[in-house]
From Swiss-Prot:
Keywords, in A-Z order: Cell cycle, Cell division, Chromosome partition, Cytoplasm
Record protein name field: Segregation and condensation protein A
A matching Pfam family: SMC_ScpA
Similarity remark: Belongs to the ScpA family.
Record's function text: Participates in chromosomal partition during cell division. May act via the formation of a condensin-like complex containing Smc and ScpB that pull DNA away from mid-cell into both cell halves.
Protein origin, superkingdom: Bacteria
NCBIfam families documented for this protein: PRK00104.1-2
Subunit record text: Component of a cohesin-like complex composed of ScpA, ScpB and the Smc homodimer, in which ScpA and ScpB bind to the head domain of Smc. The presence of the three proteins is required for the association of the complex with DNA.
Name of the coding gene: scpA
GO cellular component labels: cytoplasm
GO biological-process terms attached to the record: cell division; chromosome segregation; DNA replication
Length: 235
């Protein structure tokens, strides 16, 4: 099965997406938390053997530097530091956010004018629908990447587990469906609770995407950072 996740427009676009979930000013976000989410996303892409563009890896190295500096004991400087990579990054994000908002406004104005001067193309509507769909899948993927990062930490502290390579998506679809035998909904955490290896988690996630694609389950989240709910589709 070929699973494709729509990529972001670049590392700043991914970071802005992560920052926007906190619903605060860019300069007030918990930067270490955002960095950990970004690095978890990149690590999950690599674990799934998906291609990661060089610009994302370059940003990852810059973020690791910022994170390490944030975790060091704070030292009072007699003179202000001119080269602050964290403030430089936040300034870039703020500038990118303004540019993106302006681009969206111009695109909306263009579509409004097109209603009066020409017949709107069907392709535009189709592309918008795809963007909306992929965005929800990307949110699910970002949540999964954070869970996988946490699970790997737990497994590294436990006994050595031998990786099994023959997990099948079809089998994992059955595993997920069993969660709905006695109830109509479950949480993402419950589905992944018994996973023992990285391969098992990845295959289970791909099975979940397939069930969503087949309209057998839906994904809900009441608010940012709240539990992700999986619900059985009514037939």
């Amino acid at each position: 099965m070929d699973i494709k996740l729509k990529d972001f427009e670049g590392p700043l676009d991914l970071l802005l997406h992560l920052v926007s979930k906190y619903e605060v000013d860019i300069y007030d976000v918990p930067i270490v938390e955002v960095i950990e989410q970004y690095l978890a996303y990149i690590a999950t892409l690599q674990a799934m053997r998906l291609e990661v563009a060089g610009e994302y890896m370059l940003m990852a190295s810059q973020l690791m530097l910022i994170k390490s500096r944030n975790l060091l004991p704070k030292v009072v400087e007699s003179t202000p530091i001119e080269d602050d990579p964290e403030m430089e990054l936040l300034s870039q994000l703020e500038e990118y956010r303004r540019f993106k908002v302006l681009s969206e406004e111009l695109a909306n104005q263009h579509q409004e004018r097109a209603k009066y001067f020409s017949k709107p193309k069907q392709e535009v509507i189709f592309e918008d629908a795809i963007l909306l769909h992929d965005k929800s899948v990307m949110d699910l993927f970002l949540t999964f990447s954070q869970m996988m990062s946490q699970k790997q930490k737990e497994l590294s502290n436990s006994q050595t587990v031998i990786e099994k390579e023959d997990y099948r998506i079809e089998d994992m679809m059955i595993v997920i469906e069993r969660h709905f035998n006695l109830k109509k909904k479950t949480t993402l955490q419950e589905v992944f609770a018994d996973c023992q290896t990285k391969s098992e988690m990845i295959t289970l996630f791909l099975a979940m995407l397939e069930l969503i694609k087949l309209h057998q389950i839906t994904v809900e989240q009441d608010s940012n950072f709240s539990q992700v709910i999986l619900r059985k589709e009514e037939k």
